Regions:
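An interfacial alpha-helical scaffold signature
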Residues: 1-182
Length: 182
């Protein structure tokens, strides 16, 4: 992230610098509690603090830093599955964890009306037929007339050979082959 400007110096950072002269002021990713143990990749970088407790202008970036979903501006997740999708998307977790999480999750699927109990599949832009499911109401496409809640494991049993697309209109989506959910 060398093209991004250095982190803004906040009043809290200035207070900390005044209390700790002749040190480094470390900028921590927002996903972490500054008073807890921070992994090396959770430190954005540091400003030098002089003998008077003033923060220097130069910011030293941590080359090991990997931004968390929060640092990337992703919205607060509303479920464990959304949280995992964000951590996978930001490069902190493995895609291999996704199938088991989908099977354990409550998902929202298309429903044409309140009595619709079918699993509906739709073609994507290339013509491939997929079953869409959403992790929360916020991700339900506005064009859907309705939705119903199902367990991932129950939905997996009804996919046939059709892949499952999670949060089809984004911003974070995932495509899982039906075979990955058996």
């Amino acid at each position: 992230m060398p093209d991004t400007p250095p982190p803004e110096i906040t009043p809290r950072m200035r207070t900390s610098a005044m209390a700790n002269p002749n040190t480094w002021l470390y900028v921590i990713d927002p996903a972490f509690d500054a008073d807890a143990d921070i992994p090396p990749w959770g430190v954005v970088g540091a400003y030098r603090v002089d003998a008077d407790g003033e923060i220097g202008r130069a910011f030293r970036r941590n080359t090991e830093y990997r931004p968390s979903p929060a640092a990337l501006g992703m919205p607060a997740p509303s479920s464990d599955l959304e949280r995992l999708l964000q951590w996978i998307t930001s490069g902190h977790r493995e895609e291999a964890e996704l199938p088991e999480a989908v099977l354990r999750a409550r998902l929202l699927i298309y429903a044409s009306g309140p009595d619709d109990r079918a699993v509906t599949a739709f073609p994507d832009r290339t013509g491939r037929v997929m079953v869409p499911a959403c992790t929360s109401v916020a991700h339900v496409p506005p064009a859907w007339p309705g939705w119903r809640e199902v367990w991932g494991r129950d939905l997996a049993a009804q996919l046939g050979d059709h892949p499952l697309v999670i949060n089809p209109v984004g911003p974070i989506t995932a495509l899982l082959p039906a075979a990955a959910l058996t």
